[in-house]
Amino acid sequence: MIDRIPVPFLNPLFKFLFNREWDGPSTFSILMMIGFLTASYLLPKELKRRKLEPEHSDWLLLLGILGTLVGAKIFFVFEIWDQIFVETPGFDGKYIYPLTHWYGFPGRMSLWDNLFSGSGLVFYGGFLFGILFITLYMKYFQLDIASYLDAAVPSMAIGYAIGRLGCWVSGDGCYGFATNVEIPLLVFNYHGAHPSGVPVWNTPLIESIISFLFFFYFQFWARNQNFKKFSIGAQYLVLHGFARLLVEFLRVNKAVFPLMDPPAFVNIPNAEQNPEFLTQYYWHGFSQSQLVSIIIILVGAFFILKWKLWKKENTSNI
């Protein structure tokens, strides 16, 4: 995996200005920026094509990104909540100390450090807060929320697809558990974390491929079918929800709704450093992302059934 791209001629300047080394921009950040630029190119064109107001595209993108970052961090904190606020011998209370000390309890996950670090992002938190932020913006300016969300779907799909490539290339850890299946690219030997060299499911690439397929579907076919208003948005909720639900069966994630006994190492601190962690891991219950996926699927299906969104408009309105 390639975590960063070195820029040798900038390192001396960075060291002179900030008195520290700089290894170069992260591949994750670069691909996230490419995803943002791609979306910023497509969205105003789609708004204009639909006879909406393209001048809102910049704010929609910026608020979408801001909401994504805020929500992804908040959901990550919820995900590791029981690793932050724990009874620790020698310390008074399990809530006050983590709230008043940046690094929290010694040897434990910290609240503030994780909240403001560059890592630790939960997709569905970002997805929900991103939609919330742009919806509040559209509500404030009295825009047609359903039409604008329809217009944003292709940009959301391509942005997510490129962003997931960043997860894979940088080796940020959102991989699957070990497998003996041999499928080029979809299974790879992970060297970015412990245990090194274990063949695992390449879940970031799997999600990226699926999201690229969604983009092609919405960009080159569905948007030209004259579906009823919000059909595109509702379809995306259902399709993306199903995709995420299924991929999560291959990922290493904590089960918030367990259905069977957990793997032997799952509740041991720093278990990922044990070579047997990934090889003995298995899906043992629904994760936070899977529960949110089910809710999103149901929401999308509700709108499709309630408004009969499989039907097409009688006359073109775009």
Swiss-Prot record:
It comes from the Bacteria. Its EC number is 2.5.1.145. It is a multi-pass membrane protein. Its main location: membrane. The chain crosses the membrane at residues 24-44, 60-80, 115-135, 198-218, 285-305. InterPro entries: Lgt. One of its GO terms (biological process) is lipoprotein biosynthetic process. GO terms for cellular component: plasma membrane. Pfam families: LGT. The keyword Cell membrane applies. Keywords: Cell inner membrane, Cell membrane, Membrane, Transferase, Transmembrane, Transmembrane helix. Pathway: Protein modification; lipoprotein biosynthesis (diacylglyceryl transfer). A 1,2-diacyl-sn-glycero-3-phospho-(1'-sn-glycerol) binds at residue 164. It is found in: Cell inner membrane. Belongs to the Lgt family. Catalyzes the transfer of the diacylglyceryl group from phosphatidylglycerol to the sulfhydryl group of the N-terminal cysteine of a prolipoprotein, the first step in the formation of mature lipoproteins. HAMAP family: Lgt. This is Phosphatidylglycerol--prolipoprotein diacylglyceryl transferase. It comes from Leptospira interrogans serogroup Icterohaemorrhagiae serovar Lai (strain 56601).
